[in-house]
Amino acid sequence: MFIQEPKKLIDTGEIGNASTGDILFDGGNKINSDFNAIYNAFGDQRKMAVANGTGADGQIIHATGYYQKHSITEYATPVKVGTRHDIDTSTVGVKVIIERGELGDCVEFINSNGSISVTNPLTIQAIDSIKGVSGNLVVTSPYSKVTLRCISSDNSTSVWNYSIESMFGQKESPAEGTWNISTSGSVDIPLFHRTEYNMAKLLVTCQSVDGRKIKTAEINILVDTVNSEVISSEYAVMRVGNETEEDEIANIAFSIKENYVTATISSSTVGMRAAVKVIATQKIGVAQ
C-alpha cells in the first residue's frame, strides 16, 4: 500500500538572489513526490513497484478515481481517509481498519468480483466507532458498495456513518414531480415508454390548495404490451377531508398513450395538485 506524502512546495528563493531557494535536485524530488501522490490517488498503486509507475504499462490517471486492489497483509495497516478500495475475499475474509477521520471525510469499498459472502465477509473496523454498530461492521452481500463518512470528530474521537448498496442494477426514477390538475378536472402524466419496464410501483399524493383534502396511495402497475393495456392495483390508501366513504378525492387511472404509459389523475376539487414518484421498476432481462 503506497503511503501518501504531504504536499511539497518548491522553494523558488528570492528574486535576483541566485543563492536562495531549492537547488534543481531538491526541487525535482519535490515535483516527483507530488506527482507520485497524484498518480497513486487516481491510478493503480501496484504499478509503482516497476520503474516508479512509468513506462508503457505504467500508471495512468483515472478521471473517475481508482479503487485500489491491495493484498490482505497490506490491510493490517489502517486505510487512509479519502481512499477507495476494491476488496477481494476469494480466499479468505478481509478485515480493514479505518483511521480516525475529520468531519466529512469519506472511505469507499467495492467488491467487483462478487467474492464477498457470509463465509468470506468484509469486516470494517473504525478506530473509534461506526454509528449504530456494536463492534465491527460486517458486509456479507456480493457486489456491494460501502460508503463510510465521518459525521463527528469531537474531542479526538470520530464517528462514522455508512451506506451499503448494490454496485449494479437499475436505480433510476423515470418520473418524479408535481403536476397541477387543470380546470378541466384531469391531468395526463407520461411515466415511461411502454417497452421500458414490465412493472412499476408509484407513490401518488393529491392535495387541495387549502390542504383540507388529501389522498395518498401506493400503486403497482403491470404493463401489458401485447394488448396495449395497463393493469393497476391501488393500496395503502389514506384520505383526509373526504365527505363520504365513496368520495375518492382524486381518481387515478393508467393507460398507454402515444406509446407511453400514462397516469391520468382527475378530481372535481378545483386547484388540486398531484405529486407522483416512481419508486421501483422491474424489467425482464436485467442482468443478475
UniProtKB/Swiss-Prot annotation:
Induction annotation: Expressed in the late phase of the viral replicative cycle.
Protein origin, superkingdom: Viruses
Recorded domain comment: The C-terminus is bound to the baseplate, and the N-terminus coiled-coil domain is associated with the long tail fibers.
GO BP field: viral release from host cell; viral tail assembly
Function (record text): Peripheral baseplate protein that is part of the tail fiber network. Connects the long tail fibers to the baseplate and, after virus attachment to a host cell, probably changes its conformation to trigger the signal for tail contraction. Involved in the tail assembly.
InterPro entries associated with the record: Baseplate_gp9_C, Baseplate_struct_prot_Gp9/10_N, Gp9-like_sf, Gp9/Gp10_mid_dom_sf, Gp9_C_dom_sf
Coiled coil, from the record: 20-80
Native source organism of the sequence: Enterobacteria phage T4 (Bacteriophage T4)
Subcellular location: Virion
Signal sequence coordinates: none
Protein's recorded name: Baseplate protein gp9
Keywords: Coiled coil, Viral baseplate protein, Viral release from host cell, Viral tail assembly, Viral tail protein, Virion
Quaternary assembly: Homotrimer. The gp9 trimer interacts with the long tail fiber (LTF) that comprises gp34 trimer, gp35, gp36 and a gp37 trimer. Part of the baseplate macromolecular complex which consists of gp5, gp5.4, gp27 (central spike complex); gp6, gp25, gp53 (inner baseplate); gp7, gp8 (intermediate baseplate); gp9, gp10, gp11, gp12 (peripheral); gp48 and gp54 (proximal region of the tail tube).
